[in-house]
Structure formats: structure tokens, C-alpha cells
Regions:
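Membrane-embedded alpha-helical bundles of multi-pass enzymes
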Residues: 2-227, 436-437, 447-450, 463-464, ...
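Soluble catalytic domains of enzymes that build or remodel membrane lipids, polysaccharides, and related
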Residues: 230-508
Length: 538
């Protein structure tokens, strides 16, 4: 209701405060909103200029402060388009422009809601300028909590936390996971915003004191994160793990048109590794990990495919975690699975993980009849992938693995469930053949956060790259190139302890989002009080 808006021209007179901040002129607010999105974009891989994330937060806050709600929505939407359209450009490489445009606009819609919320709380932060940073952090966490879950299970790509893979703030994931990192980034942005707003009380040199304190607080928050420990209690044991990146005949959606060639690539790369082991030039792995879609031929039903995988497992003398597409359980349905293949005995059906969060409109089509009215391309997804029901805890023998497949690494609960189930090592099986190197590096940034969050060594195995290993403090080693065949080995320590983030689970996010709701309610009370003051003065 526009009657409850914090009027931009009369509020200072009603409150009797000539120093109250006013909205930026629209000619400045619009470019500020666009620059906010671009600044945040540059914070993410492949650019990785992480300090720009809080700068983007500050610019968006400045653009929408004291705006009417519709203007806040529009400016937030501009920020969202500037951020998500280029970030998600890899979605149009092989599927056309429509999915990219629709997904980008949908994600931008959540920043439009954030713009509304930020404009709504303007009277609160005008009265309590020192609350501005905290309020900013709370609203960002609440926005991401909503975006991560809706619609159809949400799409967490582009969370502020995932821009901090090389930042000291990454260590905060050890305490409270991705939501706490997002809160810290947005809080830092709020500190910059409060420091940079143009009208502070005080006309002399003392007017710079609050500015200096806020900037110092932003720097202290970032630097202080280095004091947060990483890792978790270990078992004292290590395992040697080989990641096989077999590559594909060609990039794009039709990579699986040569399914046998993709399988052969991974078998042959493993046989080459086995030959190196026998020759004494390479260490023998305790475990081998193949990526998602390394066998798009169901090896449980196709004897030839099963024999080829067994050939590789027997040659290397170690279990292989195979990314496979399995037919069933019903006609027209399939499963995206990680299945353990043991030397000598073959498939271990007791150690099979089925992807719990298939990607909507890519691995299954919700509301297919309606979706077909928008685009006939939905029928490219001929078979719907069936979600699994159990966490990806795979007991390989040498180690207990926490397996997630592709985009699942972006979802807090799916990864945490594997650690709660006893995972000693995190594994991400992924197929980036339909995307590009930017998407792969964005995904690797998520793996780094998960490693710190749960105090576990982690690895990412991709069909085409980037594959690599991550230590519990977030450092990457053995990263492969893109669109190449590679086999990388590392000795990895096993951990069975639990970090504070693992223990508290979803509660920090719930608490921060709940406080955001309370802030919105409090701001509503101030708006009603303002309206009564205006009415009384007439």
C-alpha cells in the first residue's frame, strides 16, 4: 500500500531531523542498481574478485533506500538481471536462449523482493543507523533461504557465500555454514553502506568518527575470520584416491549420443592408470572415482557395459565409484546414480546412491503439459529422473564417502545429511559437458565451502573438467583443465569429527531468517506510526 510508504520528501520534516538521509536521485539509483549486480558478478568465479561482493550489497542498499516499494522492486530486479543473466549464460550454450532468459528472470525476481524488503525497512535504519549493517545481513539471508527452496526445490546458484572461496570469510562456514558466510558478506556491505551514506550528524571533524569506525569494523570482520579454525577430528588414516576425467567426444547435449565412447574413455583412462601402477610410475589408489554420466549405458542391464567397468576395476585392483544412469524403476523413468563397483565381484547394490534432487526441466519436467505450451523443448527430456530417498553415504571399504551429484553440492541439507550419516570424505560427481568452464569453476567454489563447512577433504570428479581435490581448509590441488582427459591422484586424510556448522545444522539460517521477519514487522510498526503523525498534522 503506497499510503504506508516512507515518503521521500516529508519524512525528515515530520521527524524533525534535517540530517535524515534521503533517497538517491533516480538518475543515480538506476546505475547504482546495475553496478551492484555487476560488482557481485565479478566476485564469483571465474573472476573471483571477492571484495566486490559487499560492494555490490552496499550499492543495492543505497539504490533502494527510502524508495517506494514498487521502485525498490524495480531496482532490485535490475540488480538481479545484471547479476544472473551473465552468471547463468552457460545455460544457453546448448539449449537455446529461452531456458537462460527464464531462469535469469526468475532469479532476478528474488532480488526484486529483496529490494522491496530493503525499501520497507528504511524508517527503521533511519532511526537506528547502527542497525543498518545487521538488518542488511538478515534480509540477504532470508532472501537466499527463500530462493534456495522455491520453486521446485529452489536454485541456490549465486549465493553470496559461494563468491568467497578465496576470501578469509570462507572460514566462517566452519561455524555456521553458507548462511553465516552470506550474513557476514552482507553485513560487511551494510557497514560500507552506513559509512558511505552522505549525511551523518556533525559538521566538524568528529563527523568522520562513525565513518572510520564502520570501515574499520568491515575490515576487522574480514580479517578476523582468519582466526576461525578449520577441519574436524580425524581418524588418523589416509586413503589414496584417483579421480578419472575421461572426457567426452564432443561437448553439448548430444555428448551422450556416443554413450559407449564416453564409457570407453573412462575405462581406458583407468586401464592406463593401472598400467602405470604396475610399472611403478604411479601409486596404487585405494579408491577410484568416476564422474556423473561416465556410464549412461545402464551397467546393471547391459552386460557389455558391466564387463567393461569390471575390466577397469579388476585392472586397478580398487573399488570404483561409477556415475551411471540406471533404467527404472518404472517404464519411462530413470535414475541418476553413483554405484560402487568392486574388483572381482562387480556392482555392490548395497552401496548405491540415487540423486535426491533431480534438476527440474533438465532431468525431469514438472507440469509437463503446461511447460509444453511455453516450449516444445521440454520434450527433449524424454524420461523423468526419479529422486532417491536416502543420503549419499557410500561405504567403499577404504573410506565412507559422502556422495552428491552435480548441482546437489549447492544444497546445504543434502551435503550435511551425508556427514551426519558418517561420511569421512566428500565426493561430488558431476558432468559439465553441457556447460562451460565458468560453471565448473563456480561449482568448485561450492565444493571448497563444503569442505570447510564440514571439516572434510573433498573432491570433484567431472567428465570434462574441472576436477580436483580440496583440503578441509578450502585449498584446491590437482585441478584439471577443461575438455581434456586427465587422471589425478591425492592422498587424503579421513575425518569423523563434526564441526560446529555440522552440529547446528539449519538452525543459524532459521534464526537469521526469523530475525529478518521480526525486522520487517518492526518496520511496519514504524510506518504505521509515521502515518498517524502525518494524519495528526493535517
Amino acid at each position: 500500500m503506497t499510503t504506508l510508504d516512507w515518503d521521500e520528501t516529508r519524512a525528515a520534516e515530520v521527524a524533525g531531523r534535517v540530517d535524515a538521509p534521503r533517497a538517491l536521485p533516480l538518475r543515480l539509483a538506476v546505475p547504482a542498481a546495475v553496478l551492484a549486480g555487476l560488482a557481485m558478478l565479478l566476485a564469483f568465479p571465474p573472476y573471483g574478485v571477492w571484495p566486490l561482493a559487499p560492494v555490490g550489497v552496499a550499492l543495492l542498499g543505497a539504490a533502494v533506500h527510502r524508495r517506494r516499494l514498487r521502485a525498490g522492486a524495480g531496482l532490485g530486479f535490475l540488480t538481479g538481471v545484471a547479476l544472473f543473466a551473465p552468471m547463468l549464460e552457460w545455460t544457453n550454450l546448448h539449449t537455446g536462449y529461452l531456458p537462460w532468459v527464464l531462469l535469469s528472470l526468475l532469479q532476478a525476481g528474488y532480488l526484486a523482493l529483496l529490494g522491496v524488503a530493503t525499501a520497507w525497512v528504511s524508517p527503521l535504519v533511519d532511526r537506528r543507523r547502527w542497525a543498518w549493517p545487521v538488518v542488511t545481513g538478515l534480509l540477504w539471508v532470508a532472501q537466499e533461504a527463500l530462493r534456495d527452496r522455491t520453486p521446485f526445490g529452489g536454485f541456490p546458484w549465486g549465493r553470496l557465500a559461494f563468491s568467497q572461496d578465496t576470501s578469509p570469510l570462507l572460514r566462517l562456514a566452519w561455524l555456521g555454514g553458507a548462511p553465516l558466510v552470506t550474513f557476514a558478506v552482507a553485513l560487511t556491505g551494510g557497514l560500507l553502506l552506513a559509512a558511505g551514506w552522505r549525511r551523518w550528524p556533525g559538521r566538524d571533524r568528529r563527523g568522520w568518527v562513525p565513518v572510520a569506525l564502520l570501515v574499520a569494523s568491515a575490515l576487522a570482520l574480514t580479517g578476523g575470520a582468519l582466526l576461525v579454525p578449520t577441519g574436524a577430528a580425524g581418524t588418523g588414516r589416509t586413503v589414496t584416491v584417483a579421480v578419472v576425467q575421461g572426457n567426452v567426444p564432443r561437448l553439448g547435449l548430444d555428448f551422450n549420443a556416443q554413450r559407449q565412447a564416453v564409457l570407453n574413455n573412462h575405462v581406458d583412462a583407468t586401464l592406463e592408470l593401472a598400467a602405470g601402477v604396475d610399472a611403478g610410475t604411479r601409486p596404487r589408489p585405494d579408491l577410484v572415482v568416476w564422474p556423473e554420466n561416465s556410464s549412461d549405458i545402464d551397467p546393471l542391464r547391459n552386460a557389455s557395459a558391466g564387463e567393461r567397468i569390471s575390466q577397469a576395476a579388476d585392472a586397478i585392483g580398487a573399488p570404483i565409484l561409477v556415475g551411471a544412469v540406471l533404467l527404472g524403476p518404472d517404464r519411462g523413468r530413470v535414475r541418476n546414480a553413483g554405484i560402487l563397483w568392486r574388483p572381482g565381484t562387480g556392482a555392490d547394490l548395497s552401496q548405491l546412491y540415487t540423486k535426491r534432487h533431480p534438476v527440474p526441466f533438465a532431468e525431469y519436467v514438472p507440469l509437463r503439459t503446461i511447460a509444453r505450451m511455453v516450449s516444445k523443448q521440454v520434450d527433449l527430456v524424454r524420461n523423468d529422473f526419479v529422486p532417491g530417498e536416502r543420503p549419499g553415504v557410500v561405504r567403499s571399504g577404504p573410506a565412507v564417502l559422502g556422495d552428491v551429484i552435480c548441482f546437489e553440492v549447492a544444497y546445504d541439507g543434502l551435503v550435511r545429511d551425508t556427514v551426519d550419516g558418517g561420511a569421512q570424505l566428500l565426493v561430488v560427481q558431476t558432468n559439465n559437458a553441457t556447460f562451460d568452464v565458468a560453471e565448473a569453476r563456480q561449482q568448485l567454489a561450492m565444493v571448497r565451502l563444503r569442505a570447510v563447512e564440514h571439516g572434510r577433504g573433498a573432491l570433484m570428479a567431472s567428465t570434462v573438467g574441472v576436477s580436483g581435490f580440496v583440503t578441509p581448509d578450502g585449498r584446491v590441488s590437482g585441478a584439471t583443465g577443461f575438455n581434456t582427459r586427465a587422471v589425478v591422484l591425492r592422498q587424503m586424510a579421513l575425518a569423523d569429527g563434526r564441526t560446529p556448522a555440522t552440529r547446528v545444522g539449519v538452525w543459524p539460517e532459521l534464526a537469521l531468517a526469523g530475525l529478518a521477519v521480526a525486522v520487517l514487522v518492526a518496520a511496519g510498526g514504524l510506518r504505521r506510526a509515521h502515518r498517524r503523525e502525518v494524519d495528526a498534522g493535517r
